[in-house]
Swiss-Prot record:
SUPFAM superfamilies named among the record's database cross-references: Proton glutamate symport protein
Keyword Nucleotide-binding recorded: no
GO BP: L-aspartate transmembrane transport
Protein name: C4-dicarboxylate transport protein
HAMAP family: C4_dicarb_transport (MF_01300)
Residue stretches spanning the membrane: 4-24, 44-64, 76-96, 142-162, 184-204, 222-242, 289-309, 326-346, 352-372
Gene3D superfamilies named among the record's database cross-references: Sodium:dicarboxylate symporter
Family from the record: Belongs to the dicarboxylate/amino acid:cation symporter (DAACS) (TC 2.A.23) family.
GO cellular component, one term: plasma membrane
Keyword list, A-Z: Cell inner membrane, Cell membrane, Membrane, Symport, Transmembrane, Transmembrane helix, Transport
Cellular compartments annotated: Cell inner membrane
Role played: Responsible for the transport of dicarboxylates such as succinate, fumarate, and malate from the periplasm across the membrane.
Length: 428
């Protein structure tokens, strides 16, 4: 039993995170130097994301009997994303107004270091709904795979899957090759995941070593408020959605616990994307649904990021005494409904979208971003964890709505009555 525990990825990642925190706290300079370990692991994951999405989506779509089902799945997914992410934005807005974590700080924007956020502000200028939509179309197929742009790869994979389906029996050989290639790719993922403890250790040691636990104290009220809001969102909102769909949110969280720990260590929900594709399919969701919902959700269904954006924007207003009446807050909400869709599931993207939103609203001082620049990295974990759980729940919900969910398999796996519910831990 003890040997099995030590070999489990869950235990190894958890231990690595704890060691990383201790190293970063007691030896901050050494901890800060561990950054390449975390970066290398995330890069290895990103290396494999494009082929995983391509194989999953192509085989899922080409293997379907009707192409109408694909369109229906996409429409249902986008509707769900819009509804739930809007709820997340509103919840963040309500709680930050009730708790008011920035009230009483009386910060003069003129005293803030605007240079510290200049890079993010410059990147934010490139954000926009037209630019975002145009960026979905790749300049070339090779370019889409080379850059690892999830939506570009997804677009090409959907078109390829449709074309392959239309070939019928003539395309069977290509289908078999891609399916075999998919098995090889998931084999590579299993090898990469063996390095997850090292990546989690490096990323956590760097975070604590560079920013220090002390940086949490000054703006701790915002951090605590944000974490509690994310927990409430997962338990109450996603929990209710899960219950209506027919499963327990707590059992689901237990099922993806390894992926959650990897995300906690790397602070990027993207690092768990390949494994989520595999685990959601083994949970009873059809491959075509998983292939469409999970990758799309990484741009359109970032619940944690949505909560963060409203709370951070209003916090800056409160801290700098920039009065926001109901009209300003509604304007903020409308802008965020658009700008939040441009955030990807990678570290730092939420802060860039926040900069874009504040610039677009115009009522808030952009220099106010400097207030949360130092603690943004600590809030990134809660964003990423909430995003991951949200996309997992979305996949099950959409699969049920389009009648592509194996309810018996879902129940068996979550209740450990099937082998799939026990064999996903990687040990070595």
């Amino acid at each position: 039993m003890k040997t099995s525990l030590f070999k489990s990825l869950y235990f190894q990642v958890l231990t690595a995170i704890a060691i990383g925190i201790l190293l970063g706290h007691y030896y901050p300079e050494l901890g800060a130097q561990m950054k390449p370990l975390g970066d290398a692991f995330v890069k290895l994951i990103k290396m494999i994301i494009a082929p995983v999405i391509f194989c999953t989506v192509v085989t899922g779509i080409a293997g379907m009997e009707s192409m109408k089902a694909v369109g229906r799945t996409g429409a249902v997914a986008l509707l769900y994303f819009e509804i739930v992410s809007t709820i997340a934005l509103i919840i963040g807005l309500i709680i930050v107004n009730v708790v008011q974590p920035g009230a009483g700080m009386n910060v003069d924007p003129a005293t803030l270091d605007a240079q510290a956020v200049a890079v993010y502000a410059a990147q934010a200028k490139e954000q926009g709904i037209i630019a975002f939509l145009m960026d979905v179309i790749p300049g070339s197929v090779i370019g889409a795979f080379a850059s690892g742009n999830i939506l570009q790869v997804l677009l090409f994979a959907v078109l390829f899957g449709f074309a392959l389906h239309r070939l019928g029996s003539k395309g069977q050989l290509i289908f078999n090759v891609i399916e075999s290639f998919s098995q090889v790719i998931f084999g590579i993922i299993n090898m990469i995941m063996r390095l997850a403890p090292i990546g989690a250790f490096g990323a956590m040691a760097f975070t604590i070593g560079k920013y220090g636990v002390g940086s949490l104290v000054q703006l701790g009220q915002l951090i605590i408020c944000f974490y509690i809001t994310c927990i409430l969102f997962v338990v109450v909102v996603l929990g209710t959605i899960a219950r209506v769909t027919g499963f327990s949110i707590f059992k689901f969280i237990r099922y993806i616990r390894e992926e959650l720990l990897i995300v906690l260590g790397t602070s990027s929900s993207e690092s768990a994307l390949p494994r989520m594709l595999d685990k959601m399919e083994k949970l009873g969701c059809r491959k075509s649904v998983v292939g469409l919902v999970i990758p799309t959700g990484y741009s359109f269904n970032l619940d944690g990021t949505s909560i963060y954006l409203t709370m951070a924007a209003v916090f800056i207003a409160q801290a700098t005494n920039s009065h926001m009446d109901i009209f300003h807050q509604i304007t903020l909400l409308v802008v965020l409904l658009l700008s939040s869709k441009g955030a990807a599931g990678v570290t730092g993207s939420g802060f860039i979208v926040l900069a874009a939103t504040i610039s677009a609203v115009g009522h808030l001082p952009v220099a106010g971003l400097a207030l949360i620049l130092g603690i943004d990295r600590f809030m990134s974990e809660a964003r990423a964890l909430t995003n991951l759980v949200g996309n997992g729940v979305a996949t099950v919900v959409v699969a049920k709505w389009v009648k592509e969910l194996d309810h018996q398999k879902l129940d068996d796996v979550l209740n450990n009555r099937a082998p799939d519910g026990k064999t996903h831990e990687i040990s070595f």
